[in-house]
Amino acid sequence: MEKDRGEIFRKEIENLLKGKDIPVKTDQLGNYSIRFKSKTGKKVIAIFAHLDEIGGTVRNIKKNGRLEFSRRGGYEGRWLVSRTVEILNKEGDWIKGVIAGRASHSTPEKLRVSEKFDPLEMEIYLGASNKREVLSDYKIHVGAPIVFSGEFGLLNPKVNNNVIAGYSMDNLTALTCLVVLTQKIAKNLLDDFGCIMSSHDVCIVATAREEIGTEGAFFFAKNNQIDEVIGIDIGIVEDISGSVHSGIKLNKGPVIVWQESFGTGVLDYKLCMNLTKVAELNKMPFQNGVFEFYGSDAGKAQKWLGIPSALIGIPTMFSHNVPEISTLTGIESAAELIFQYLKNFE
């Protein structure tokens, strides 16, 4: 879950900053952060990427041993049937389950074309025969967290060393980008004393609870003096007929997001334009995006706290599904764009 992923993030950052007096800090909501201090500290820029992933929570244990669940984060029921999940039991072990659904062999034609799948009506099969087994043998309780099960890595490593696939690309891609960005800063922008050679401080923040309301980013931004936010998240790649999209391509560079959340999340125009100029000056490919069914840490900081905020998306296909598809070059190019912005920020 978030804490385990946060501790992995901590170790990666600490390895990059060995010998530097730059501690990784945590707060009450589970955010992990470091601060690169400048000599003047005129401004503070925070770079956000979230730790959490979509999942669920056990809502009810039925007499027949199946589990009913509620969602964590936004996703649809239509792709859930036969997906493998893992449930954290009270002893800290992960128990595998499969989301149940009617088999094709027993589904009449009229339901095949018209049936809607509501996650609230779906069940998870564990192998238990009754409720007692779930409680005593599997040691699962109401309130237990659920995550989708899967692996991640190169999709076809023998023929393609760029395209990656797996669960939770939202937001493992952005977290990886945050680590790559930290590496670039540590290697190129720090002096012998560990100060960033800039007029501004930079906070690197792995945020908690984004998928359930961008709570971690809001908490961090509200409790720290932040002058500017750049969020890193996925950029929606979509070309299926009937979908709403901005024509983003998987291999055409990072996405500068101008608007999200049905038009209620408008990112800072000046900051977005500045990122555009940085990309153009450095001859870096980039894309422009507007996302409707989508919200982010950056959008929350902009809307609710009035902090000038921008969002960089790493092109990703099949978002909030398992697996999701992204690229290693997408991660690297997003990190490079933000690095060049920080390097030239005034």
Model segments located where?
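N-terminal hydrophobic/helix-forming segments and targeting peptides
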Residues: 1-346
